[in-house]
């Protein structure tokens, strides 16, 4: 069923949407957008505590998702199942589940919410949803 959903998403592709999704997915590469936000928040005294909470969430996320779960579950990527689909980004070499981009995004959003960052967590949630969607749109995750 999952592969059928991803295959259906392929019908949504347009040159403009392809570029937008590539840009959005690259914001999540190595959690870069969340790491930058964390550093900025740590540097600002008013948001330092929230930045530390975010840093802790990202560290736990990397250990739990990228080091433990990915290797334990060892799920192949969709482009390895359906080799006919043209992948528009560099093919990741690690396993598919869980998505590091998505996990880092939602770990950050959760940290912002729990830290009481009312002005930040909602836009961060919107970005996290877009990053998660981009990973499926680009055929690198289920």
Residue ranges and their predicted role:
Residues 86-142:
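Membrane-embedded catalytic cores of phosphoryl/pyrophosphoryl-handling enzymes
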Residues 1-32, 66-93:
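N-terminal transmembrane-helix/juxtamembrane module of multi-pass inner/ER membrane proteins
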């Amino acid at each position: 069923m999952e592969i059928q959903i991803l295959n259906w998403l392929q019908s949504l592709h347009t040159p403009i949407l392809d570029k937008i999704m590539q840009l959005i997915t690259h914001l999540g590469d190595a959690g870069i957008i969340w790491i930058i936000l964390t550093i900025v928040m740590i540097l600002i005294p008013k948001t330092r505590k929230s930045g530390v909470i975010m840093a802790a969430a990202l560290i736990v996320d990397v250990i739990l998702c990228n080091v433990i779960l990915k290797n334990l579950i060892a799920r192949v990527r969709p482009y390895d199942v359906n080799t006919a689909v043209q992948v528009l980004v560099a093919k990741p070499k690690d396993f598919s589940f869980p998505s590091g981009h998505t996990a880092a995004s939602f770990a950050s959003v959760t940290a912002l919410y729990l830290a009481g960052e009312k002005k930040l967590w909602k836009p961060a949630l919107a970005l996290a949803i877009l990053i998660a969607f981009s990973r499926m749109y680009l055929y690198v995750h289920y």
